Amino acid sequence: MTLIIRTVFVIVVCVSFVARAQERPASAIEPLRFHHVHLNSVDPAAAAAYYPKPFAASAVATTLNGFAAVKTGNVYLLFTRVATTPQNELTGPQTSIWHFGWNTPDSQAYDKRFRAMGLEIAQMWDAADGKLVDMSSDTLPGLPTQEQILEMRAKGVQPTHQGGFGYLRGPDGAMIENAQAGTTERFNHVHMYHEHPRCAMEWYATHLGATIPQGRGAAAEPPATGDCHTKLYAPPTWPSFAKTGFVRDPSGGVNFGDISISIRPWPGGGLVSPRGKIVDHWAVSTADLDVTVARLKRENVKFLEEMHPWGASRAAMIEGPDRVAIEIVEVK
C-alpha cells in the first residue's frame, strides 16, 4: 500500500486532534469547571517545588486546603503524602489517566532548556527499528506507521525539528507533556486512555456538562446505529514509548472551558483504578455540591466517596469510564 493510500485510509478511519475547534452547545446542567489534578507523592513539598522550574511563566508553588500545591492559571496540582513511591505506567498496571501537560510557545526550546536544567526527559522511539528521541518533531512527520516511515526514508524525508510534543519525567515518576501551541505557556490538558473514546466523550458531556469540540474525534463518532463502542482501531504509529508503536486512533476529547480532557484509545480494556497511583484523580468544581450530587445520583453515576468535608469546603468522588476517579469539589 502506498504512502498516499495508507494516509487516506488513516484519515478516514481515524483522526488527529483539531485544536480549539468550534464547540457543540454544552448540556443544560449546572456549570462544572476543571479544578485540579491530584497526585500522590513521597515528598509533596518537593514535588510542588518542581513544577515552577520547567514552567516558570505559569506555575507557582502554594498550598490549598492543607495540601502542598501548584497553582497554574485557574487550575491546581495537589499532592498527598504516601509512604512509598506510587506506581506509574512503568511500574504498575495502566490506569485511565495517562499524563497531564502544558502548551508552550516553543516546545523544542523548552526541551533544550529542560536538558540544560538537568531535568529528566521521557524519550520516545522514532520507529520500530529506530532510536530514542526527545520530541515528536525529531521523528519523521505526520505520526507515521512503520510502512510510511520506510517509504519516507526511501524518499529522503527528514524530521523538521520544529515544534511538536515531548515529555518530562517528574517527581515520583509523573509524566508531564510539553506541547507547542499558541504563544503563551499554560497548563492545558489531562490525557486519558479509554477503551471506547466516543462512549467516554458522551459520558463526560452527559454527566459533567463537558463540551465536545466539532471536528475532534471524527473517527470516534457513533455510527448510524448510535453504538458508541469502538469496532476498529487504527494501526500503530510513531513516536511511541513502546518500540512496537502506539495506537492513537480513534481519538477524541472534551473541554471544560480552556482545559481539555484528551483521549487516546486503549484497545481491549482492562484499565485499573487510579486511586493510590501516581495520578490519583482529577477534579471539577461546582458552586452547589448538593445540587450536583443529587443530579448525579438520579443519573445512577457510581459514587466512590459520599459528600464529606474538604478543608473549609466539601467534596464527593465519582467513578467515570474505565474506572477513572473524578472528584467534585464545592467552590462558592
Question: What is each model feature region?
Answer:
Residues 1-4:
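N-terminal secretory signal peptides that target proteins for export/translocation
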Residues 17-21:
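Sec/Tat signal peptide C-region and signal peptidase I cleavage site
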Residues 38-43, 102-104, 192-198, 284-287:
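Short, surface-exposed ligand-recognition loops at beta-strand->loop->(often short) alpha-helix junctions
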Residues 22-29, 112-192, 214-255, 262-265, ...:
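Vicinal oxygen chelate
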Residues 58-64, 211-220:
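Conserved catalytic-core motifs of GNAT/GCN5-like acyltransferases
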Residues 6-16:
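Bacterial N-terminal signal peptides
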Residues 28-63, 68-69:
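Mature N-terminal segment immediately following signal peptide/propeptide cleavage
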Residues 42-58, 110-117, 196-212, 296-299:
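Amphipathic alpha-helical segments
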